[in-house]
Amino acid sequence: MSMRTEYCGLVTEHLLGQTVSLCGWVQRRRDHGGVIFIDLRDREGLVQVVCDPDRAEMFATAEGVRNEFCVQIKGLVRNRPEGTVNAGLKSGKIEVLCHELNVLNASVTPPFQLDDDNLSETTRLTHRVLDLRRPQMQHNLRLRYRVAIEARKYLDEQGFIDIETPMLTKSTPEGARDYLVPSRVNAGQFFALPQSPQLFKQLLMVANFDRYYQITKCFRDEDLRADRQPEFTQIDCETSFLGEQEIRDLFEDMIRHIFKTTIDVELDAKFPVMPYSEAMARFGSDKPDLRVQLEFTELTDAMKDVDFKVFSTPANAKDGRVAALRVPKGGELSRGDIDGYTEFVRIYGAKGLAWIKVNEKAKGRDGLQSPIVKNLHDASIAAILERTGAEDGDIIFFAADRAKVVNDSLGALRLKIGHSEFGKANGLVQAGWKPLWVVDFPMFEYDDEDARYVAAHHPFTSPKDEHLEYLETDPGRCLAKAYDMVLNGWEIGGGSVRIHREEVQSKVFRALKIGAEEAQLKFGFLLDALQYGAPPHGGIAFGLDRIVTMMAGADSIRDVIAFPKTQRAQDLLTQAPSPVDERQLRELHIRLRQPEQPKA
């Protein structure tokens, strides 16, 4: 016989007058004038249980229970007395009069109250089992489950096949570091945990599976941020015989379907599309948050001949940029606010933050308030006011440096101001969801340290057809058939059309200074497969953790993963990673070298 007949949170008026069996945990026990009330919790919610002293044996047991005891109760569902209804609970109109109470397992005193919202992350992750009992974590993980289910439903309906790819694979150290797994059988050799199923899913397209997907773990040994984990989950997809636009349309519909069916959000009927170059020019980011109603103004050309070296030097540098950020009504900002923003942009490499307050635009330079106005000639001031569209009461911030520093610092300032209380009060940020596609990424980035080009995405991304000739003559001019889906400033998915011809893939390897011998050693299996009539193909991978984090309104992806790692890639619950037995190391033919101690 089942230990329970109902979930606690689902006991409502439809069960009035019925006897139910419930199992769960004691959220709270209260003794009110000889009657004991127990808030009993399971995954569906709470129900109030009333323990009357008329049943002596049951009541004695109730007197001994404490928070987080695991118990079973049997009792009668009845209406709560008038004036005691709890509108905040699904079960708030009823209570269960307890007839039997069995303690299934006692609990030691928990290290924290489950309703404490001020717990440190260290405490939460160390006691993750208890943390997961909290309603918000229950909600987050069930939301994650629903997102995965809806993704599967959509992909199944579109003819995709769920195929598993290997977790032990070949190390191809391009980009992030691999997690390496030593082979006991093949001494001195290593597997790598996959950073993505990229090459295997391409091979599946060559193998005529046409449409593939899996929801899979991926691994990257990199420095962590709030939105990164050493192991993360992707909704990984690949399809044959579709062009870039068709692929984007297919997966845009999937994301629209997931948001509608899981959190009842209607995303735009058609996502806007923005070239990478435009995103960087307007927002300083390839994942712009379109909720923030602030944009850059380009001033590099207008500052080349000013006496102000802070502006003219980067304006005349090959990799320099001068840009402005106009903040409507920003004249209200105090000097303390401005000083705070100045310190903030230093985090991103900026040396300072120039600014101009527009008091009376009609008066020209006399109507401007700023320590830099005296260093700018009339033509440059006119360009600033005209291009920014500044009005009385605005403030204009400036960044002048290498383009990367300008983009990073002014882009971060844009978000900080937009999402601040000032920004919210003055309509500088909109509510809701703002998706877009960013396309036409550079194929390569130049690595000054190694004096060579590296792949901006990965080396299997196809260049645009009209840029194929640049692979051998000017790789820096190549644009890729790559696309990222961005939502509210987060990249939630990224993909590309792949190279499906061996000769093009070999040209890309040469552009990356990967010689024929090295290419054969690392990627020979792919080059061989491409010679057997590989179809045109492409795909995308979505970050499941990121999507659920946004839907849940969580602060970190650690809040939507059952057992996450810290920012130091540690599991505080199991204390992993940890030392291993010397015998295990000998079996793997591994000897540890202690890290060198820093010199005094």
Curated annotation (Swiss-Prot):
Residue ranges of the region described as Aspartate: 198-201
InterPro entries: Aa-tRNA-synt_II, aa-tRNA-synth_II, aa-tRNA-synth_II/BPL/LPL, Asp-tRNA-ligase_1, Asp-tRNA-ligase_1_N, Asp/Asn-tRNA-synth_IIb, AspRS_core, GAD-like_sf
GO cellular component, as recorded: cytoplasm
Predominant localisation class: cytoplasm
Annotated SUPFAM superfamilies: Class II aaRS and biotin synthetases, GAD domain-like, Nucleic acid-binding proteins
Biological processes, Gene Ontology terms: aspartyl-tRNA aminoacylation
Record-linked Pfam families: GAD, tRNA-synt_2, tRNA_anti-codon
Localization of this protein: Cytoplasm
Record keyword Cytoplasm present: yes
Keywords: Aminoacyl-tRNA synthetase, ATP-binding, Cytoplasm, Ligase, Nucleotide-binding, Protein biosynthesis
Record flagged with keyword Aminoacyl-tRNA synthetase: yes
Signal peptide interval: none
Entry EC number(s): 6.1.1.23
Enzyme class: ligase
Residue positions binding ATP: R220, D221, E222, Q229, E491, G543, L544, D545, R546
Binding locations of L-aspartate: E174, R220, H457, R498
Subunit and partners: Homodimer.
NCBIfam families linked to this entry: aspS_bact (TIGR00459), PRK00476.1 (NF001750)
Family listed: Belongs to the class-II aminoacyl-tRNA synthetase family. Type 1 subfamily.
Functional description taken from the UniProt entry: Aspartyl-tRNA synthetase with relaxed tRNA specificity since it is able to aspartylate not only its cognate tRNA(Asp) but also tRNA(Asn). Reaction proceeds in two steps: L-aspartate is first activated by ATP to form Asp-AMP and then transferred to the acceptor end of tRNA(Asp/Asn).
Protein's name according to its UniProt entry: Aspartate--tRNA(Asp/Asn) ligase
Encoding gene (name): aspS
